[in-house]
Amino acid sequence: MKFFVDTADVKEIRELNDLGLVDGVTTNPSLILKSGRDIIEVTKEICNIVKGPVSAEVAATEYEQMMKEAAVIARIADNICIKLPVTLDGLKACKALTSEGHKVNMTLCFSANQALLAAKAGATFISPFIGRLDDTGINGMELIAEIRTIYDNYDFRTEILAASVRTVNHVKEAALIGADVVTAPPATLKALVKHPLTYKGLETFLADWAKTGQKIA
């Protein structure tokens, strides 16, 4: 499984990348707003830090404008992945852009039908939103499972990028089901390593080591 970090905070991205935990980055208009920076400037900086795909989203709803904005975004760096909404115009833009060799991340996916159409349009990634579905009373993980089955049935190459991930349990369940990628906020990725018994065991080992009076280096 690949880990993408869902943020436009360059400091957080750099920290996680230095740990070897970042395979890519996802951003959206809300994260750009939170960063307080120009989208082109911050996206270019992120692309210079991370070697993997960096998703940057268009802010358009109609095909023609999507294509204009996608052209600007695509020029930022070679590892750019253009992010489009799963709408009819978005699917049309996806088909056109992937035909030109661009990577495309189809976002705001809430149904298996949408995921099927995105794969047919040649999307590089499909981003089903787990947490937002959970908020409506629908189990977001069931959607991941449905998409996995459909993609496996027809050997679609589109990768399932589990998004709107809020908890470490979301990450575990997505991995068990077979999502190709999880994108999560920095805090969630860092929380994956935490377990009380790990820290308790470490405390015991260090206390016993101190009693030996030895040094390794």
Curated annotation (Swiss-Prot):
Cellular-component GO terms for this entry: cytoplasm
Pfam families assigned to the protein according to its UniProt record, in alphabetical order: TAL_FSA (PF00923)
Family designation: Belongs to the transaldolase family. Type 3B subfamily.
PROSITE patterns, A to Z: TRANSALDOLASE_1, TRANSALDOLASE_2
SUPFAM superfamilies named among the record's database cross-references: Aldolase (SSF51569)
Enzyme class per UniProt: transferase
InterPro entries: Aldolase_TIM (IPR013785), TAL/FSA (IPR001585), Transaldolase_3B (IPR022999), Transaldolase_3B/F6P_aldolase (IPR004731), Transaldolase_AS (IPR018225), TSA/FSA_arc/bac (IPR033919)
Protein name, as recorded: Probable transaldolase
EC number: 2.2.1.2
Organism (species): Brucella melitensis biotype 1 (strain ATCC 23456 / CCUG 17765 / NCTC 10094 / 16M)
Active site: K83 (schiff-base intermediate with substrate)
Catalytically driven reaction(s): D-sedoheptulose 7-phosphate + D-glyceraldehyde 3-phosphate = D-erythrose 4-phosphate + beta-D-fructose 6-phosphate
One MF term in the entry's GO annotations: aldehyde-lyase activity
Annotated pathway: Carbohydrate degradation; pentose phosphate pathway; D-glyceraldehyde 3-phosphate and beta-D-fructose 6-phosphate from D-ribose 5-phosphate and D-xylulose 5-phosphate (non-oxidative stage): step 2/3
Keyword match Transferase: yes
Top-level lineage group: Bacteria
An individual GO BP term: carbohydrate metabolic process
Keyword Transferase: yes
Known role: Transaldolase is important for the balance of metabolites in the pentose-phosphate pathway.
Phylogenetic classification of the source organism: Bacteria, Pseudomonadati, Pseudomonadota, Alphaproteobacteria, Hyphomicrobiales
Compartmental location: Cytoplasm
Gene expressing this chain: tal
Gene3D superfamilies tied to this protein: Aldolase class I
Keywords recorded for this protein, A-Z: Cytoplasm, Pentose shunt, Schiff base, Transferase
